[in-house]
Amino acid sequence: MAYTSIIIDDFYNNPDEVRDHVLTQDFNIIGNFPGARTEPMLNESTKEHIGMHLSEVHGDIHWEDNKEYNGSFQYTTKGDTSWIHADEWNHWAGVLYLTPGAPLNAGTGIFKHIETGLYKIPRLLDGTIDRELTDKIYDDAGDPTKWEVIDVIGNVYNRLVIYNGDLFHSSLNYFGNNLTDGRLFQTFFFDTYKK
């Protein structure tokens, strides 16, 4: 059985406290993503909590602590735009929604590339990425008419969605005007290894 996504509701025991703390942080990192991010804030208890949900089925988690976005908080507003992409450099990516009362349709979409029929990064027999085909697919990353939505995960407060890093995905339906009423979330990236 292959798992492509995992949803964990009520992730933090104290989401309101987490959110209140996050709202006092500096969102000063701008990059190849919509909105702005904090410095990474991945702590041991969060790692253990995610591991508790995944390790039995997927194996031990390996965290790339030096990844600049691992555990970062990010926010976007209605003026932001995104594109369809994959996070193929790791086995898993995660998004934890932290805006209470957010529109449900402002979650994460999983997409299939219409021309190729692929919904995840193409890999060669040795497991490496088929770079030529991936580049062709990524030429269509910003054109939603080239893609079909195959799954939508709703934006529910304190919900962590973990998905296979090879899946083509995008955030959906930005909202709000600022940090306090925009789409606030935390990002995670990691690998799993069976013993």
Question: What annotation goes with each model-predicted range?
Answer:
Residues 1-84, 107-108, 114:
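Non-heme Fe(II)/2-oxoglutarate
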Residues 78-195:
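Catalytic core of non-heme Fe(II) oxygenases with the double-stranded beta-helix
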